[in-house]
UniProtKB/Swiss-Prot annotation:
Gene3D superfamilies per the UniProt record, alphabetical: 3.90.1150.180, Type I PLP-dependent aspartate aminotransferase-like (Major domain) (3.40.640.10)
Statement: the UniProt record of this protein carries the keyword Cytoplasm: yes
Subunit and interaction comment: Homodecamer; pentamer of dimers. Binds only one seryl-tRNA(Sec) per dimer.
Organism (species): Shigella flexneri serotype 5b (strain 8401)
Superkingdom of the source species: Bacteria
Pathway per the UniProt entry: Aminoacyl-tRNA biosynthesis; selenocysteinyl-tRNA(Sec) biosynthesis; selenocysteinyl-tRNA(Sec) from L-seryl-tRNA(Sec) (bacterial route): step 1/1
Swiss-Prot/TrEMBL cofactor(s): pyridoxal 5'-phosphate
UniProt-recorded name of the protein: L-seryl-tRNA(Sec) selenium transferase
GO cellular component, as recorded: cytoplasm
Function text: Converts seryl-tRNA(Sec) to selenocysteinyl-tRNA(Sec) required for selenoprotein biosynthesis.
Length: 463
């Protein structure tokens, strides 16, 4: 060992000496003596490794307390950190999909703080059913005879098939064999549910006679799957649920539908593209309809199944129902969200998903122009900051073809180097509240459709 190396090792402090320093008192109070000591030992090992490798001390050896504080602060951050979503995707799967209404947030807080009547019937002091309150609301909203709640729509489809068609055939059009995120495929779900998939028609054209010819003594269901995350256009043919229900009645085979996104209101009244609604399919005679709680409905992650009473009863009594059931927080949030639908005149104000989807491009552009000046003052030396029109998307596989006119703040490096955009985006991701945009066409775009808290936005970007 050289004299220089020996000198570097001698500069490493003893843990006891560090802990006696006043700057470590607050760290021990905040993070605990055990964790602080554990980290100091780790850092000493790191420092020795640096000395062995490069004959230098790490820069942080100049202020051990500051480095410990920085590391423990980062370590203490929640894995689920709040971010500012300026990607232009309203229902961003990677960012948690639907923002919850204040009523839903309050309902969850209450359910977490106190015992609740999850499965307790106050009328007869006996055991109740956890889906009962939501079933009443869903019957009222959709016109269905009964309802069942599980933890997501994939689970809803699995339960629906396992409880009503295990060991039998399910007839589906080839044009509806969808795959959603995470390689979740309808054929795979059928296999897990114990069903046999009977494909009919072609990718772009399926006729009523295709279903008719497929039905046999082992057919359990005729199934429709709403292709909410893609669109087949051009030379196409598909039969709707009403026509399929008529055929099912003739052949004595129930019809079920996986609706996917599941809007409970006609979106066209807000100037948005219309999506099929569960109540329309129930009115058409579909036996079971499944849809998501955290997409267009604007609630928590949940799988909702509405339909005929006798078929819902089969779902409720199936062993998978207990494995897939929703917890009290989900049910509390979903109930509060569904109650908002009982007052449709206030829905676009109180339901964040609908409020963000219905923001006009003109309002968003005015907001962008208002925010442009302080950002130019802060970033103008390196970037051209402009207000530009853009197109938002709904996201989470909802209305895949349709885009929403919006406005964005764009950042273009004066030197044209893409690495500067990557660096800027990375800096914003490291903020206390990360700001998430998207890089496209030589610019960093901040689509302001989902920006409601301007003060927090400026506090972050002007740091």
């Amino acid at each position: 060992m050289t004299t220089e190396t020996r000198s570097l090792y001698s500069q490493l402090p003893a843990i006891d000496r560090l802990l006696r320093d006043s700057s470590f008192l607050s760290l021990r109070d905040t993070y605990g003596h055990t964790r602080v000591v554990e980290l100091l030992r780790q850092m000493l090992d790191e420092a020795r490794e640096v000395i062995r490798g490069s004959q230098t001390l790490p820069a942080w050896c100049e202020n051990w307390a500051q480095e410990v504080d920085a590391r423990l602060t980062k370590e203490a951050q929640s894995a689920l950190r709040p971010v500012i979503n300026l990607t232009g995707t309203v229902l961003h799967t990677n960012l948690g999909r639907a923002l919850q209404a204040e009523a839903a947030v309050e309902a969850v807080a209450q359910a977490m703080r106190s015992p609740v009547t999850l499965e307790y019937d106050l009328d007869d002091a006996g055991r109740g059913h956890r889906d009962r309150a939501l079933a009443q609301l869903l019957r009222r909203i959709t016109g269905a005879e009964d309802a069942c709640i599980v933890n997501n729509n994939a689970a809803a489809v699995l339960l629906m098939l396992a409880a009503t068609a295990s060991g039998k055939e399910v007839v589906v059009s080839r044009g509806e064999l969808v795959e959603i995120g995470g390689a979740f495929r309808i054929p795979d779900v059928m296999r897990q549910a114990g069903c046999t998939l009977h494909e009919v028609g072609t990718t772009n054209r399926t006729h009523a006679n295709d279903y008719r010819q497929a039905v046999n003594e082992n057919t359990a269901l005729l199934m429709k799957v709403h292709t909410s995350n893609y669109s087949i256009q051009g030379f196409t043919k598909a039969i709707d649920e009403a026509e399929l229900v008529a055929l099912g009645k003739e052949l004595d085979v129930p019809v079920v539908t996986d609706l996917g996104s599941g809007s409970l209101v006609d979106l066209s009244q807000y100037g948005l593209p219309k999506e099929p609604m569960p109540q329309e399919l129930i009115a058409a005679g579909v036996s079971l309809v499944s849809f998501s709680g955290d997409k267009l409905l604007g609630g928590p992650q949940a799988g909702i199944i509405v339909g005929k009473k006798e078929m819902i009863a089969r779902l409720q009594s199936h062993p998978l129902k207990r494995a897939l059931r929703a917890d009290k927080m989900t049910l509390a949030a979903l109930e509060a969200t569904l109650r908002l639908y009982l007052h449709p005149e206030a829905l676009s104000e109180k339901l964040p998903t609908l409020r963000l989807l219905t923001r006009s491009a003109e309002v968003i552009q005015i907001q962008a122009q208002r925010l442009q000046a302080p950002l130019v003052a802060h970033y103008g030396a390196e970037f051209a900051v402009q207000v530009m029109p853009c197109l938002s998307q709904i996201g989470s596989g909802s209305l895949p073809v349709d885009r929403l006119p919006s406005a964005a703040l764009t950042f273009t490096p004066h030197d044209g180097r893409g690495s500067h955009l990557e660096s800027l985006a990375a800096r914003w991701r490291e903020l206390p509240v990360p700001v998430i945009g998207r890089i496209y066409d030589g610019r960093l775009w901040l689509d302001l459709r989902c920006l409601e808290d301007e003060q927090r936005f400026l506090e972050m970007l002007l740091k």
